[in-house]
Amino acid sequence: FDKAKWLNDILNQEGITKSVIVGQSMGGYVGQAYAQLYPDKMTGFVSIDSAPLQRSYVTAVEIWLLKRMEPVYAHYPWKWLLKSGSEGVATSDYGRNLMREMMLTYDGNQKRYAQIAGHGFRILAAAIEKNLPYEIKCPALLICGTQDHAGSCIRYNKAWHRNTKIPLTWIEGAGHNSNTDKPEQVNRLIDEFAANILQQET
């Protein structure tokens, strides 16, 4: 929720009163927290390879695991973590290299990488456990790669679409970072979505 509040502060600072929030992975969770806190300020929401925050979608085992990921990241051999981390989130060389480059920032400081990742998973678990509605009251779009193997993203998105009727677009052959695997397609979907909202507003 801190991130959603920071986002609101930034939008206020910039004088933006009606926003289309686009969030990838953790960014999609921030968007849902923003919708919970400021439901009247969002005119659109795009989730890219993220998942619903409602408690009903997540098993108790998944929440238990989210809270305990830091030691896994800390004790996993760094070379293997680097390989699985970069190859696990993307299918394209471009996407994998971006992830590898980011992870190499922590080369020699795996403990710090594990702390940051663990913190992210714990705040996600805490947001889910709040058991809030996280209702999206504005036009929305779900985007997910067909090769997204991060957690249970594919299963979550199918259920999210089925339960809410929010349109879901699959990005063929893309991984968890579908915006880096198929950037042109994802950008086009976002552009069209935002243009439709703008048209409705005028």
Q: Positions of the model-derived regions?
A:
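Active-site loop/oxyanion-hole signature of alpha/beta-hydrolase fold enzymes
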Residues: 1-22, 188
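Short, hydrophobic alpha-helix immediately C-terminal to the catalytic nucleophile
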Residues: 8, 32-36, 187, 191
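Active-site acidic short loop of glycosyltransferases
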Residues: 12-18, 39-40, 137-138, 165
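Gly/Ala-rich beta-loop-alpha elbow adjacent to hydrolase catalytic centers
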Residues: 23, 27, 31
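Flexible "cap/lid" loop of the alpha/beta hydrolase fold
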Residues: 36-37, 43-75
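Conserved alpha/beta-hydrolase catalytic His-Asp/Glu region
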Residues: 56-58, 75-135
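Conserved loop-alpha-helix segment in the C-terminal half of the alpha/beta-hydrolase fold
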Residues: 140-174, 180
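Catalytic active-site module of serine/aspartate enzymes centered on a nucleophile-bearing elbow/loop
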Residues: 164-202
